[in-house]
């Protein structure tokens, strides 16, 4: 049985292709999550009116890859110490955020944030939130880097 995780770590194109290559991750999809509306568009998200983050939704097999390993990778592929930015991308849609589905995911994510606060220089600014108002991004964003 697959498990699901939704993660925000900057522009969703790069993280999607990276997560899709992990052994045990069977499906990735980019979208928007954590905003004030149940539906949104890329333009609305970029304008900053909806408070959605660009996210990667992934379905994984916990018998092959653990939730902890996915979160380890999450912390490795972006800078969780920069507020509302990754590289040259700035705005709340590029924030670092872990969206949890249940209390077990929430508790594990809290421990992982504590772990990386001890390892990394700089304070972790990754938010931890229950999944709210997820919607799939437009088709042209799906597998964007694979299409190039």
Descriptions of predicted regions:
Residues 2-148:
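Flexible coil/turn and secondary-structure edge motifs
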């Amino acid at each position: 049985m697959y498990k699901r995780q939704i993660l925000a770590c900057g522009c969703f194109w790069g993280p999607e292709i990276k997560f899709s290559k992990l052994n045990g991750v069977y499906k990735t999809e980019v979208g928007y999550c954590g905003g004030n509306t149940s539906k949104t568009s890329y333009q609305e998200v970029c304008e900053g009116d909806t408070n959605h983050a660009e996210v990667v939704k992934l379905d994984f097999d916990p018998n092959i890859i653990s939730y902890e390993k996915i979160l380890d990778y999450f912390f490795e592929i972006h800078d969780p110490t920069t507020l509302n930015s990754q590289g040259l991308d700035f705005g709340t849609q590029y924030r670092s955020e872990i969206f949890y589905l249940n209390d077990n995911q929430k508790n594990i994510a809290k421990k992982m944030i504590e772990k990386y606060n001890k390892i990394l220089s700089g304070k972790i600014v990754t938010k931890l939130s229950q999944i709210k108002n997820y919607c799939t991004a437009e088709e042209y964003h799906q597998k964007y880097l694979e299409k190039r």
